[in-house]
Amino acid sequence: MPHIDSMMTPFPHSIEASVTIHDAQAIMASEGIRHLPVTSEGRLVGMISDRDLKLAYALAGSSQSEETLHVGDVCNLEAYITEYNTPVDDVVMHMAEIRVGTAMITRNGKLVGIFTTTDVCRNYAELLKIAYPDA
């Protein structure tokens, strides 16, 4: 079974927990991404998604503006993190079991990649082409 590092997206963008949600949304829009691993003082602490940002904007209302809410205030601190040499099937099954669309991939505690449902679909399509070359 191949390891997750053979199917992940390497060197993902990440964001510091102290950055405003406004800036996080701008980064996601400019890079065309939906997930950002969150770091604090160089340590991986969570994940923020475009869905998290939409919810934060909806709940903030007049109590907090987008300039005062920070990524660390709204990110998922329970994000799925696994090592680069974990078998792909284990990662995909665990993602399905805990119902998440993203896994952050580390090597010796350092972020080296991200694996999303988009990566699952891309790799599945490649396998289908191999299994059914004449289709």
Which residues fall in each region the model found?
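C-terminal basic regulatory modules in eukaryotic proteins
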Residues: H70, G101-T102
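Tandem CBS (Bateman) regulatory domains
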Residues: M1-F11, S49-Y80, P87-A96, L111, ...
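The conserved cystathionine-beta-synthase
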Residues: S14-G32, T39, I81-R99, I105-T106, ...
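A glycine-centered beta-loop-beta connector
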Residues: M28-E31, L36-D52, M95, A103-D119
